[in-house]
Amino acid sequence: MAETTMKININNFKRIDVMQGEKQVSSEDDVVFSTVLGSCIAACLYDPIAKIGGMNHFLLAEPSGSDHDPNSLKRYGVYAMEVLINAMLAKGAHRNRLRARLYGGATMRSGFGDIGIKNAEFARRFLQDEHILLNAEDIGGTTARRVDFCPALGLARCRHVENQRPVERLEVVPDKAGDVTFF
């Protein structure tokens, strides 16, 4: 699904960072939500009539059977999606008008399983089950993303953060015995 690029200048907008486990909702014209994603997912929802939008940022799709800690719920997509939708409805959005954009779900490191893929599959399935139209997505791959979303306008920009070259490691030479002078 092709992504459209934001064609407005957001330099003077009030920037609100959306960190892992958080959600933000606004109807203000001069607000932009921003987040950085790897395997996590950010869902940007928007009601085009009410001009209300929101963004969440979740780490994992669904809790495992062994996770019974209520404090960890914020990490999961099922919680993040419901909380975002409820906050938007409380501000005046209508569920049947919601539109979505999805970002993230990258495979950042081998050995961590298919976390990004599972997150993306969950988000798509959730939107389908809730009859929320998916307008755009930038999902998968192996690079991190920076996402900016103007909630009142429903516009988003997603930029891939290219892999940086590895940090050069300096060799540490241990001190020789007897190199210390005591006073």
From Swiss-Prot:
The reaction(s) annotated as catalysed by this protein in its Swiss-Prot or TrEMBL entry are: L-glutaminyl-[protein] + H2O = L-glutamyl-[protein] + NH4(+)
Keywords of this entry: Chemotaxis, Hydrolase
Gene Ontology molecular function terms on file:
protein-glutamine glutaminase activity
Question: If you read the UniProt record, what top EC class would you report for this enzyme, in one word?
Answer: hydrolase
Quote the protein name from its UniProt record: Probable chemoreceptor glutamine deamidase CheD
- Give the organism, scientific name: Zymomonas mobilis subsp. mobilis (strain ATCC 31821 / ZM4 / CP4)
Q: Which InterPro entries match?
A: CheD-like_sf, Chemorcpt_Glu_NH3ase_CheD, Cytotoxic_necrot_fac-like_cat
Record function comment: Probably deamidates glutamine residues to glutamate on methyl-accepting chemotaxis receptors (MCPs), playing an important role in chemotaxis.
Q: Which family does this protein fall into?
A: Belongs to the CheD family.
State if Hydrolase is listed as a keyword: yes
Report the Pfam families cross-referenced here: CheD
Question: What does the entry give for GO biological process?
Answer: chemotaxis
EC number(s) stated in the UniProt entry for this protein:
3.5.1.44
